[in-house]
């Protein structure tokens, strides 16, 4: 009898242990997913430091030498520089364009996932440093206004023309750089340099902006904006951005722009390659970097857990 009683107790104990293990696993899984979504919601609630509403990217292509429309005379340095200025002017003058910006390369294109970092340190004390995102922008355009950047001090909207880009050592940074490198002191007018490049230049901070997010679900980061005056060889790598008046930002905008500007932007050997809204760019980046996929996986796990509990 004692043996039978003992066996029954052990069987019940094993059954209870398995129930406890299952509940513990379910709790851990639920906690993991709830924590993930809590962090996502928190990160997305933070200011992004810039905006993408009504912003479009204009990509220009360059005819190959094998094209029947290619003109060799348009590829020399003087012609390239002149054509670059004409492209910018025609984008600025398009009806409904409120601001136009140009920046160099993929890494200077917001929300594409491309990344190019730079270290910044107090030139007088390089132990105080911060690694930040690097953007190279054409100061004759209004890149900062296109993406609605704002001052760290009072939140006012920023224009690229607010700063003295005539100084070849000019740099504009963000609040995180100021705080990490200079503490409570203002960074404006102070010298910074890349601590990892001993032979590199020393920059002078011309302004401090709000920190920006690389992605919507990431924390705000520091950034540095430097001027680029592209050479003829660098011009084909430039990207162009326009922010349009909400009044013309209807579904017909893209079709109308392509129809008219395909002719207007046929400058030298350049042609209009692609016009993409930032809504589309952000959606594509979220998908390609797994953000959309992560959501789907965790939502599926949540549904599976809910059905089985």
Predicted regions span which residues?
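A short amphipathic helical element positioned immediately N-terminal to and/or at the very start
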Residues: 1-12, 87
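Membrane-proximal extracellular/periplasmic loop immediately following the first transmembrane helix
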Residues: 34-126, 130
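A cross-kingdom feature of multi-pass membrane systems that activates on extracytoplasmic/periplasmic
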Residues: 258-296
